[in-house]
């Protein structure tokens, strides 16, 4: 018998939750392709090793950008490989799959995700909004008629939402998150230190010494890259410099400020009763970005948000796993409570349900978005 799965199809990583097992796969969203033949050579962590290696015969692709598919063929190959690897298909059955997406996803982007998941082996494929699923994975009761606020900072998008009664009350989706912060670091070091580094090194810097605030005791780190200064008439020679957490905060400041500003706007849009709930319960912070600054005393992104929003901020227990876990949990819940499944998958009122039924059913009668058939 097939096992249902929940997929966090992230810009940086793919996580898959398997029914009865929990998180069974966590791999980089990377595909390595032979330039001459267009053949897929490696996927996931095996492909990630080729980033910045300078091999002209191999093209390294990150098939998702800003939380949505940018290379359909590579995404399809990647998902198919991962699903087959988990052996979730039955002898004569295929799994139900829930995939998560940003709240500002377009109709074309929705269809691409659904089709990729179907090609990977899904029978009924569902799409749900990421902050809603992240909230479930973080342990929040989204069906309670109490206000909850979630900030989910992933690789490609930052999704901010207020939820109550099983629905999203208001939300923002910024195509500005972990990957943008990594690019900010690369750009800053190029301009301020005259050194060129690649994505893997920038990721290490972000994780090890990154800070969301200027701190009294920054952590230092010595890094190596290519010299971009031409004082000796020779560019590209190896170069070593020492940086610290306050340098990295300066590099990331503008992007972090945009996320904070959007969170303030969300809080300004909600009713006083919901605002009171959020003050009492705090904001739940999820996604890989929730760990930013966690190694620097006083530099965590939770501290930044709490300082700027004047609301308690809590980091979920397993922020990297919340979306995949929440997707799997919703599918399992839907199977147990099928009479209430429309609410589970986000159809909160008749007009919204009608709109989804009209706009999002595609190609095959058994492929739907935000819809479980009774």
Segments the model singles out, each with a brief description of its role:
Residues 1-153, 161-283, 290-374:
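Nucleotide/phosphate-binding catalytic cleft detector across ATP-hydrolyzing
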């Amino acid at each position: 018998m097939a096992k249902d799965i929940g997929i966090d199809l992230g810009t940086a990583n793919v996580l898959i939750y398997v029914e009865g097992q929990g998180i069974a796969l966590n791999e980089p969203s990377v595909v390595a392709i032979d330039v001459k033949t267009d053949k897929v050579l490696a996927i996931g962590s095996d492909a990630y090793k080729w980033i910045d290696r300078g091999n002209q015969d191999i093209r390294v692709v990150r098939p998702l950008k800003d939380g949505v598919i940018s290379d359909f063929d590579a995404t399809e190959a990647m998902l198919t490989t991962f699903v087959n690897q988990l052996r979730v298909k039955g002898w004569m059955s295929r799994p139900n799959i829930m995939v998560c997406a940003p709240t500002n996803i377009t109709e074309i982007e929705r269809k691409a995700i659904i089709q990729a998941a179907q090609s990977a082996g899904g029978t009924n494929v569902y799409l749900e909004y990421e902050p809603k699923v992240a909230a479930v994975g973080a342990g929040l009761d989204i069906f309670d008629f109490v206000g909850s606020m979630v900030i989910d900072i992933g690789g490609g998008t930052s999704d901010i939402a207020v939820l109550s009664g099983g629905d999203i009350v208001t939300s923002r989706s910024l195509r500005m998150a972990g990957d943008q912060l990594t690019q900010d670091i690369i750009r800053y070091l190029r301009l301020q230190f005259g050194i060129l580094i690649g994505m893997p090194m920038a990721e290490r810097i972000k994780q090890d010494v990154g800070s969301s605030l200027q701190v009294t005791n920054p952590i230092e780190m010595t890094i190596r890259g290519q010299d971009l200064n031409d004082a000796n008439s020779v560019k590209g020679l190896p170069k070593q410099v020492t940086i610290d957490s306050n340098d990295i905060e300066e590099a990331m400041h503008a992007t972090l400020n945009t996320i904070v500003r959007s969170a303030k706007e969300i809080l300004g849009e909600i009713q006083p009763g919901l605002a009171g709930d959020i003050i009492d319960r705090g904001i739940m912070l999820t996604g890989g970005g929730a760990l930013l600054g966690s190694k620097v005393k006083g530099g965590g992104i939770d501290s930044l948000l709490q300082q700027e929003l004047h609301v308690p901020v809590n980091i979920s227990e397993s922020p990297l796993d919340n979306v995949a876990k929440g997707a799997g949990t919703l599918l399992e819940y839907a199977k147990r409570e099928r009479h209430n499944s429309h609410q589970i998958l986000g159809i909160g009122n008749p007009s919204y349900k009608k709109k989804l039924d009209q706009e999002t059913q595609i190609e095959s009668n058994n492929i739907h978005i935000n819809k479980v058939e009774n």
